[in-house]
Amino acid sequence: QPNSDNYYINLMNKNLHTNHHQIVIDTPELAEYLEDAMIARDMPGMADIDSSLLLFFKNVKKEMTVSLTGECADEIFGGYPWFFREDALNSGTFPWSIAINERQKLLNPTSGKKVNLKRYIDYRYNESLSKVEILDSDSPETAEKRKISHLTLNWFMQTLLDRSDRMAMYNGFELR
């Protein structure tokens, strides 16, 4: 993040009379909880992003057992760079995973030869886009936004919902 949210948090806290607590997690603690995050997910996931969320819920659980979440607001209201950056809109693939060749290299050589990651991703991307209903009245820009919204809601958002639910429930914390 280019700027801290503290100014806005304090402003909201003052005007809405809410009670906020700051949770600071350091790098060694993030690393310590990587395995727990992987267990919570039942597979490797987003590494430190998962462990930080798991630790966040662990700390919040000390005060309460259930919470409303703002998860998916960016997906619904177009808060990600791929909703407005031309290079992302015109990437021809899922905009949050443009670096397919780098991901292919993560596979061991035997699996890498058997799995054509690019072909699979292209297939799923095009299959998903074929389900998007473009209106006759849509401008090209609106059609692209409609496509990117569909991809985000049906792929990216589902991943985040699953991730949040698993990290919370690992701590006995419930999200709504």
Placement of each model-derived feature along the sequence:
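ATP-dependent adenylate-handling active sites, centered on carboxylate activation for C-N bond formation
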Residues: 1-145, 160-176
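Catalytic donor/gating beta->alpha subdomain of glycosyltransferases that bind UDP-sugars
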Residues: 157
